[in-house]
UniProtKB/Swiss-Prot annotation:
It comes from His1 virus (isolate Australia/Victoria). This is Structural protein 27. One of its GO terms (molecular function) is metallocarboxypeptidase activity. It is found in: Virion. The keyword Lyase does not apply. Residues 20-40, 423-443, 470-490 are annotated as: Hydrophobic. The lineage of its organism: Viruses, Viruses incertae sedis, Halspiviridae, Salterprovirus, Salterprovirus His1. One of its GO terms (biological process) is protein processing.
Length: 505
């Protein structure tokens, strides 16, 4: 069909609607199909925004030689949609049209060769409406066609859609501004002071936003359009070198820096914590106040020093808990628990970490670290917390010198008293309890050694093994006759340290 169905502009230009703006959609198809057009009454807004909504990412369904006009005399601010009933492709316009001022947005889609055009007209109440802008999509590019024949454009792909915003329309000087946003509201390019129906400078790097499929009419939330201001700046390292591909985030708005380390985002008025982050660098956060004007916020990121800090007692003993902290992370939330360049072992001379055990884990997972106490190695598994560190590795069954079977009979034998009276490990509890109560003061005072650590021990020699097998009766007899002192061989050790043998007769 070749006959165009349009509504005369003369019918619009009546006294009743002289100051009323209207929305005009010109959609072009190869066949005549009805449209669903639904203006949103009383939705508020402050700008003119057009979203082109080819859900399937191609322009092939649109054809030339047939046009339709759908008009409304009640163009409240808000969201509008037009969709062919037999097609899933939808055109959306969000406009600031009210009963007093604004431009008409006319959408004219044509595609016989994968081409499309989006027309913006001003003064719908006038028979002499001017064309504000002619945005076209052709062979993978979005361009702006000017009345002087110049042809400039934006490089795009069909993977995503963009939002075109025509704003700040100045009828007196016949100027307007245009800006292109991605689906998150980040500015992809802009031009200020464009002449009506004149060429617009090119903008690069725009991806088209592909809306969710499954519905013929996309559901844009109506509501007040929030004025946004541009926040831009540069991200460098501490030497001032630009950092490309750094992430800059403020609330849910995020972008990455270009090759020059520059970024730009749009934010509504308010207070924000804006953060710059890049792998292997410490994030930097600044608080800013957005109040309707452009702001510049620069960042300087320092390299993360991959250091391990160990804080513990003088020596390692079995079942000891040692705080273990690794400060190394990046913006993806992964933590390297072993790739460090410096070990700080504060007074932990017999403890070392196996640096060859490289492990890269995400937060919340378990990290396995090899820990060596003296000459023996154990593997310790701990949780990588969301606070970016691994903490409190419990060293289970670390062999010590002397061996662990010589575990202390008295704990804290360093001040003349056995601090743990309930002996464990060798002999029954009752034997050791009685042994401790009776001879504690004698042995402790005789063999106290001032250099013994709090965790040092006293291990009896031959007599101890005899007591294990002959039982409580012989112990009582030996205590009663006082003959045990000459038989006791006492080994006193420092935790993980050398053994000292003391013979008393």
């Amino acid at each position: 069909m070749t006959e165009k169905t349009t509504k005369s502009k003369n019918s619009i230009a009546t006294k009743n609607i002289v100051r009323v703006s209207l929305i005009c959609f010109l959609l072009v198809f190869s066949v005549t199909v009805p449209f669903v057009f639904s203006p949103v009454s009383n939705a508020s807004g402050q700008t003119t925004t057009l979203v082109d909504g080819f859900e399937d990412g191609t322009l092939s369904p649109w054809q030339t030689f047939q046009s339709f006009s759908v008009n409304t005399n009640n163009p409240y601010k808000g969201d509008y949609s037009a969709v062919a009933n037999s097609d899933d492709n939808t055109i959306f316009v969000t406009t600031n049209n009210d009963q007093y001022t604004a431009a008409t947005v006319a959408v004219n889609i044509k595609d016989s060769n994968n081409n499309a055009r989006i027309l913006f007209q001003d003064r719908p109440d006038s028979n002499n409406a001017d064309l504000l802008a002619n945005i076209y999509i052709e062979s993978g590019n979005v361009g702006f066609y000017g009345g002087n024949g110049q042809d400039t454009g934006i490089d795009i792909s069909y993977s995503e859609w963009v939002v075109f915003e025509i704003k700040n329309i100045d009828y007196s000087n016949q100027k307007y501004d245009i800006e292109v946003y991605d689906k998150s509201g980040n500015s992809l390019g802009s031009f200020s002071g464009a002449d009506f129906y004149d060429s617009v400078s090119s903008m690069n790097g725009v991806d088209i936003y592909k809306v969710d499929s499954g519905s013929r009419v996309d559901h844009f939330t109506t509501g007040e359009f929030v004025s946004k201001s541009t926040v831009s700046g540069n991200v460098t390292d501490l030497e001032g070198n630009p950092m490309a591909n750094a992430t800059v985030t403020a609330d849910s708005v995020s972008t990455t820096t270009d090759d020059n380390g520059s970024y730009s985002i749009k934010l509504a008025d308010g207070t924000y914590d804006i953060t710059a982050n890049k792998k292997n660098y410490k994030p930097q956060t600044k608080q800013i106040e957005v109040n309707g004007s452009a702001k510049t916020v620069d960042f300087s990121l320092g390299k993360i020093e991959k250091q391990l800090s160990i804080e513990g007692p003088n020596f390692v003993r079995p079942n000891q808990t040692i705080p273990y902290k690794v400060e190394y992370t990046n913006e993806t939330g992964t933590y390297d628990v072993s790739n460090y360049s410096n070990i700080t072992s504060a007074n932990t001379t017999l403890l070392s970490i196996d640096e060859t055990n490289k492990t890269l884990l995400a937060g919340g997972q378990n990290a396995t670290v090899k820990v060596t106490a003296k000459y023996n190695t154990t593997e310790v598994t701990t949780n990588v917390t969301k606070q970016y560190y691994v903490s409190y590795l419990k060293l289970e069954n670390i062999d010590t010198v002397p061996p662990a079977k010589w575990m202390q009979a008295f704990l804290g034998f360093d001040d003349g008293y056995a601090e743990n009276k309930n002996m464990k490990g060798i002999g029954s509890d009752i034997q050791w309890l009685l042994f401790t109560v009776i001879i504690m003061s004698t042995i402790a005072k005789l063999f106290d050694n001032p250099w013994a650590g709090i965790g040092s021990g006293v291990i009896t020699g031959v007599l101890l093994w005899v007591l294990e097998y002959i039982g409580l009766g012989l112990l009582l007899s030996m205590v009663f006759f006082g003959i045990f002192i000459g038989l006791i061989l006492v080994r006193v050790r420092r935790d993980g340290g050398n053994e000292v043998t003391i013979n008393e007769s």
